[in-house]
Amino acid sequence: MNKRAVAILLVGMISSGMIYFHPVYAHNFGGDESASFFAKVAEIKTEINFISKHVSDSNAIDYYSDALGEYWNANDTREMEERNALLQKEIPATINSTISDARSGNQAAVSTDVSQLNGYLDEAIPVRIDKDKLNNSTVHALAVTFVLKEVLEKYGDAINSTVNLNDISQINMGGNVQQMSVPIVDQLKYENSMGLATAAQQLFNDLAAKNTDKSTSNDKISAALTKLLQDLNNKADRNTVMTDVHIKIHPDLVSAYNIQTVPEFPMPALLIIISIVAMITITRFRSMKLRQ
C-alpha cells in the first residue's frame, strides 16, 4: 500500500469519525462492588416484598422471580461463600422458599420467609462489604444511582419506550415540552419501577440522616426524589421522568457526595486514533525498507 492510498484511507476514516462522532452524555458512574451490593440488597428486598403481595398470582410471581434471578445469581452465591458459608446457603434457599410458598398460596409462610430473608440480607452487608466502605457516604450515594438506573429501565419497559431512559442525550430539552400522562403497557414493570424508586428514596433518606452537614443538597435531592415518585404515580411521560433523575437528582448527588463519573470513549474517535497510529507504523516500516 503506497503513501497516497494510506492517506486517502486515513482521510476517509477521519471524515467518517467526524460525521458520526457525538459526545455521550449519559451518566456513567462506573462500577463499585460495595455500592452494587448495597443496591442489590435494596433491590432484592423490593422484589421479595412484591412477591408477598402477589401470593397465588402466577404471572406476578413469575415476573418477580425472574427479577430476583437477575439480582441474585450463582456468582453472588459463590462470592458470598468466600465470606460466609451459612449466608451463602441461606440467602438463595430462602429466596427459593419464598417463591415456592407464594406459588402454593401460603401467605403465612411467605411472610415468615420474607422476614428471614431480610434478616439474612442485613447480616450479609457487613460480611460482604469491607469496613472502609461500609460507612462511606460516596459508596452509599453511588448505590442510590444504581437503583435509580433500575427504576428508569423498568419504567421504560412499562411504557414501551423506544429509547433508553438511562441515556440523558435522549431528553428533549426544548422549552415547549408539556408534561403528559402515558399509557402503561406492562403493569408489573410499572409497579416494579415504583417500588424501586421508593427503595432509592429510602436509601437516600438513610444516607442524608448520617450527613446532616450536606443539608442544602440533601433537601434538593429529597425533593427531587419525591417528585420522581409523584411523576411515576401519575404515569408521566418519559421525558419528565428522565428529567427528574438526570437533571434534578444526579447533579446534586454527584457534587454533594463526590461521585466520580466515568466518561465513555466514542468508537469513531477511537477509530481515528487507531488509524493515525496505523499510518505512522506503515510510514516507519516503509522508511526502514528504503534504508535497507
Model-assigned labels for residue ranges:
Residues 25-261:
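Mature extracytoplasmic or organellar-lumen-exposed domains after removal of signal/transit peptides
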Residues 18-32, 261-265, 286-288:
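Sec-dependent signal peptide cleavage junction
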